[in-house]
């Protein structure tokens, strides 16, 4: 199965470096993250701009607070507005409106293959006002700022600042693997996404070196702390750069994992269809055998059919369904 998936990935263009690997969304996401940081201490204006984004495209603002009034918001939840289970058309519309309202210069992307998305029912990175601590959203903003600084300038001071805020946020309500998705959205070449698809892919020695797989397996059994997350992120890049894989960075890795999982899902759907078809056949296997026994072991199809109807006490409706 894995070898089939690898052929599927190569067929889609990994070895030839076609446009599928250009990831136009990265420029937009990175620029928007940088722009969002300017609202860290002016969240009231940010909330008004979010309302404008939705008004501009005649859509309702999603539920972001227990009441009707949004009193605060964090930057990862803002990214979650267009990285959750919505249609591609709505996603493009929201991003297009964001580009206008926030004056983003990067091209508005229209392809989002391989980008991890949130569950619509868990689309905020904070608990609603009665279920969160006073500094929860402030902490997320501090992590957001530290993550951008660390991604743009990897030194010991920025690494330590990132680790401090990551560990603080990791223990907050509504934070689980989604925090790694958020980090990936804002700086996809710097942070590895550890959603279920990537964890599955990274844990297979067909996709990554055995020593890497062994070193991270226990670390991804639960949401890692900062030390473990940084270990995984650094070890992954080292493994990718030192081996002959089609993927050389986190976006390519995530895209490969997405393609592989889609192939597996297609295989499961096909198998499910075959099982369903087999079950329909097996429904009549025993009655056919019994009918043949009853008529002495040899009979025309019409005689066997008549005997099955008699033995199974089939109604007119069932008989007609059988004909169809």
Which ranges hold each PLM region?
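Short, positively charged loop/turn segments that connect secondary-structure elements
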Residues: 279-280, 309-324
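Short hydrophobic alpha-helical segments that form membrane-spanning helices or hydrophobic packing faces
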Residues: 179-186, 303
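Short helix-capping/hinge SLiMs at alpha-helix to coil transitions
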Residues: 188-189, 292-297, 310-314
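An N-terminal alpha-helical hairpin/helix-loop-helix interaction module that forms a charged
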Residues: 13-172, 188-272
